[in-house]
């Protein structure tokens, strides 16, 4: 287990807004509806209440300041390898056994390669946050997947939809490779994508149609920390506040992406009618 002692950097972010807007504390207090006393308290203590975080970061976001996204760029310029994790209720510590067993690759600590990926997984939750971590993968045993049949079978296995096919030699070999690894690096599969995978697992669509539909997702890669050795390579950097306007923008973009995937699936069913079905692959 590693401890996570990150707080929102609101003191520094307030300083940035004051400078960028060329305003003083009194003007910021008027614009954000945060009292001068509260702003002074933030300068002294570096933290505040949930409602104040929301007022400040909503003000910044609605005035076109994309603080979190720009911080991602700056951190990636400073450090070579940076990963992001979205948490629904905040983190105090991280373990490799904290996730559900029916996640994409079983138990592990799941991270994405971008801030946007982490945001997308928690944008429905009012108290959610995103965390950034440094990560050094050298010397670790890494299992990599691309958008492939093996990737799809692995996720279907761990999410529990393969049924009798879960004991096939092909699937068992893939699972063995995952369980022996320190880190799994693979395309992200959200619930919209898993719906397509489950259609394949149930024999409703063939592998070619499924994979061509999934290739439209463009969610990027996830990193799954599977061992204590890999977990020790994570170094927490910062915690990011997710205000309501930013979460709503994210939700809207996910809805649009869902339309694209639905359209791609319908087109793929027409284009790839002769692909192999699961019973033919795992017979």
Locations of the language-model features?
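The alpha-helix within a helix-turn-helix
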Residues: 18, 29, 57
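Short alpha-helical DNA-recognition segment
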Residues: 22-38
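Key DNA-contacting residues within the recognition helix of helix-turn-helix
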Residues: 36, 40-41, 50, 54
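ADP-ribose/NAD+-binding catalytic cleft of ART/PARP-like enzymes
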Residues: 50-104, 255, 265, 274-283
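Active-site and NAD+-binding cores of ADP-ribose-processing enzymes
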Residues: 139-283
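Residue-level detection of the helix-turn-helix DNA-binding "recognition helix"
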Residues: 19, 33, 44-45
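A short, Lys/Arg-rich alpha-helix, primarily the initiator
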Residues: 1-21
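ADP-ribosyltransferase catalytic core
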Residues: 2-6, 67-73, 97-107, 113-176
